Amino acid sequence: NYNLKYNMESITEDYYLPLKNKINEIEQVFEKLNIKFKSFIDNPNHYDRTFFVSSGLGWQGKSTMMLTPGSGPWQLLATIYVDHAFEESKNTNYSCGECNLCQISCPTGALNSEYKLDSNKCISYWLQSPELIPYEMRDAIGNKFYGCDDCLTSCPPGQENNNVVISVSYTHLTLPTT
C-alpha cells in the first residue's frame, strides 16, 4: 500500500494547455487586426518574470514564485510582444511583507535565503531532473514522486485558489523586423 504524493502541475498531461489556448485566441485577434506579435509560453530563452512584475500584475515572492493578490503562486505566465500601444498598467507595490511561511514549509531548506532558491536542495528540481537524485535528498523526497508544492500551498494569497489562473498582461514593445 503506497501513499504517493504529487504536485498540482502533474494533474494534467499539459498543464500549460489552457494558457496556450487563451494565447492562441489573442494571437488570432492580433492577426485579424494586422498587429505584429511574438508570444512566449514557458520558454527558457525568455525571462517573463521581469514583464510580470513590471506589468503590475503581482510580485516575486520569497519563494521566488510570481504571486498575485487572490491567487498567490497559482498561475502560469506568458508574454506577448506587440507592435501596438496599449494603456499602461498601473504598477502596484506588492510584497510578502513579514510573511515567511514558504520558507518555513520547505522541507529541505531550499528557501533559506529570501528571494533565492537553492535548486540543489529543491525536491521539485530533483524529481524533474534527468540526473541521479543525490542520496542526501532521498529521505526528504519520501513519497513524493512528481514535485513538491509545500512552498506554494503555504502561501496565504493563494490559499483559496489552488488552481491555474489565466491572466493577460500587455506591455508595449516594438518587434524587430525579420
Q: Where do the language-model regions lie?
A:
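Auxiliary alpha/beta "docking" domains used to position bulky ligands
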Residues: N1-S95, P134, N143
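SIR2/sirtuin NAD+-dependent deacylase catalytic core
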Residues: E98
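Iron-sulfur cluster-binding cysteine motifs and their immediate structural context
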Residues: L101-E131, I141-V168
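Conserved small/polar residues in nucleotide/adenosyl-binding loops
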Residues: T171-T177
